[in-house]
């Protein structure tokens, strides 16, 4: 109902909602965990894209932690403290570890033959979309005032990519 929706929206506005995402990125960040505090704004030349904009951007903060490493890739948990458009994608790309298949921010498609260290083959990519997943959400229930949390399982395509990365470590 409207009052409940308003209370939840207010929590987002006040940054009281805790969100975490899982991303599969190229390479492994230098630090196991860190805070990225880089302001974001619309890209100066490409209107559909966002970029680090120190002088004119809005505050954007993301905490990340490397959960698992593989040959050439990592599974990273990201906890945005602000809610800017494309925030996680831009921040990870800025670290030089773009999200797999995120072509807008430097991520490449990954093919099974690459992971298996085999000869190039004509195959479909393991995942054809940005390997980013909204994993958990926590907020105060609008009527009971109890903290509630929700977890969404990995989509099949991301799980398949993780399975292959684990197999071909």
What are these regions (language model features)?
Residues 1-169:
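RNA pseudouridine synthases
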């Amino acid at each position: 109902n409207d009052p409940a929706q308003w209370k939840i929206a207010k929590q987002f506005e006040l940054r009281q909602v805790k969100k975490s995402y899982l991303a599969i990125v190229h390479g492994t960040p230098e630090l196991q965990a860190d805070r990225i505090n880089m302001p974001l704004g619309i890209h100066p030349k490409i209107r559909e894209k966002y970029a680090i904009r120190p002088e004119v951007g809005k505050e954007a903060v993301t905490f990340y932690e490397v959960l698992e490493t593989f040959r050439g890739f990592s599974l990273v948990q990201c906890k945005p403290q602000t809610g800017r458009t494309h925030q996680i994608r831009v921040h990870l790309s800025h670290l030089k570890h773009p999200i797999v298949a995120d072509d807008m921010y430097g991520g490449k498609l990954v093919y099974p033959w690459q992971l298996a260290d085999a000869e190039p083959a004509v195959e479909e990519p393991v995942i054809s979309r940005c390997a980013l997943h909204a994993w958990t959400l926590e907020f105060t229930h609008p009527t009971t005032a109890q903290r509630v949390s929700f977890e969404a399982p990995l989509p099949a395509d991301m799980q398949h990519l993780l399975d292959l990365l684990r197999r071909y470590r």
